[in-house]
């Protein structure tokens, strides 16, 4: 049965308008973005099938074009619709953590980093640069690829900090495996960066490791003193 044949108010768009987006399931929200389904499969059924095929909404939205377009009835247009929705979400998070904002809310920082890094299929090592009042100067992706203690150079971190005139730094990187637990290599490079920054009187406030569902904070574990 097509969505247009559903009882009034039960279609995903109508439900959203009547009750708000928070009352929709993942499949219903995705159906609103997709707009239509296939012959014999309405938009909600198509959306549910897409989510099931990838094991969840996050995995679907972080999948490559070739992976998504392998699904029956899903072509470049629907892939573009999905990516537009993802990018809008990232830009909203970026606006929420804009230049000049004082970082007084750890949850805001976590939400921003989760949106920026959790769906990457490769490792990204980044810096959140802050001024003397812990206002945001810039978020900078410094390295990409396989990151270990040998591939991250503290002198490049120091160089960027000096260039941007930062007074404090939050280091962050993601684990494409989805598991946020820091490795021994993560702890070693954190210590090296902290020591390098200390030579220019800049504080390392935290190192946050981003997984699929959580972020581990070195500061909260007492690993940065």
Swiss-Prot record:
**UniProt keywords, alphabetically:** Hydrolase, Metal-binding, Metalloprotease, Protease, Zinc
User: Superkingdom, according to UniProt?
Assistant: Bacteria
Entries under InterPro entries matching the protein: MPN, RadC_JAB, RuvA_2-like, UPF0758, UPF0758_CS, UPF0758_N
Q: Which residues form the MPN domain?
A: 102-224
Per the annotation, the residue ranges of the short sequence motif JAMM motif are 173-186
Annotated Zn(2+) binding sites:
173, 175, 186
- Which Pfam family, giving just one, matches this sequence? UPF0758_N
Annotated coiled-coil positions are none
The UniProt entry's sequence similarity note says: Belongs to the UPF0758 family.
User: What is this protein identified as?
Assistant: UPF0758 protein Sfri_3828
Q: Which organism is it from?
A: Shewanella frigidimarina (strain NCIMB 400)
Upper lineage is: Bacteria, Pseudomonadati, Pseudomonadota, Gammaproteobacteria, Alteromonadales
